[in-house]
């Protein structure tokens, strides 16, 4: 079973639905924040809370983005709840995938890696290169592939490479670090 947290759940579900594998998806929303753009009735109908799943185990967790990247992490109204979810994921989730702002949050929470401003909004589709073809998550990727970005912040390559638990799997000259793996938590078979 896969748990999808924060926002962007519908997109993640559509992306995961094109597979012969049977996947059960649970969508979770943080309860410490009231959404300005999604109705409470929609959230109550399609999402659960962290408290409701706290004692469960999941094969995967996807922590998605949020339009809060210009704020300091501790200023985000639901940071404490998200930090609790990330801590819980260490024991209750087999594999966690952080995307967009969720990736910046995960790198900060788990490794103390600070986000850094890009100087101007990075927006567009950029060329990326694989750095390790043997990793299972990128086996079907071309050596060079294109991916979209829309953000004001990223992380420094040197900060990622300086952490012995992290492996940079893909990067872009224009967009920077793209795909980072935790070697301690998720080892290749």
Predicted regions and their residues:
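Single conserved hydrophobic/aromatic residue that forms the stacking wall/gate
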Residues: 1-8, 13, 186-189
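Structured loop/turn residues at beta-strand edges in well-structured enzyme cores
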Residues: 7, 56, 91, 143, ...
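A short, Lys/Arg-enriched amphipathic alpha-helix followed by its capping loop at the start of a domain
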Residues: 14-22
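A structural signal for short, well-ordered beta-strand segments and their strand-loop junctions
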Residues: 26-29, 97-100, 118, 149, ...
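Cysteine-nucleophile active-site neighborhood
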Residues: 58, 63-134
């Amino acid at each position: 079973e896969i748990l999808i947290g924060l926002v962007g759940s519908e997109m993640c579900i559509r992306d995961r639905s094109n597979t012969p594998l049977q996947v059960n998806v649970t969508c979770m929303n943080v309860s410490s924040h009231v959404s300005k753009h999604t109705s409470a009735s929609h959230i109550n109908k399609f999402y659960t809370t962290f408290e409701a799943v706290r004692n469960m185990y999941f094969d995967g967790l996807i922590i998605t983005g949020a339009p809060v990247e210009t704020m300091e992490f501790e200023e985000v109204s639901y940071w404490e709840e998200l930090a609790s979810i990330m801590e819980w994921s260490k024991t209750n989730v087999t594999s966690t995938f952080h995307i967009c702002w969720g990736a910046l949050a995960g790198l900060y929470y788990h490794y103390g890696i600070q986000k850094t401003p890009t100087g101007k909004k990075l927006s567009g589709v950029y060329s990326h290169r694989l750095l390790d073809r043997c990793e299972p998550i990128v086996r079907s990727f071309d050596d060079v592939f294109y991916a979209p970005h829309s953000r004001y912040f990223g992380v420094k390559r040197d900060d990622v490479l300086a952490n012995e638990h992290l492996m940079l799997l893909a990067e872009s000259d224009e967009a920077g670090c793209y795909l980072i793996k935790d070697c301690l938590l998720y080892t290749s078979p």
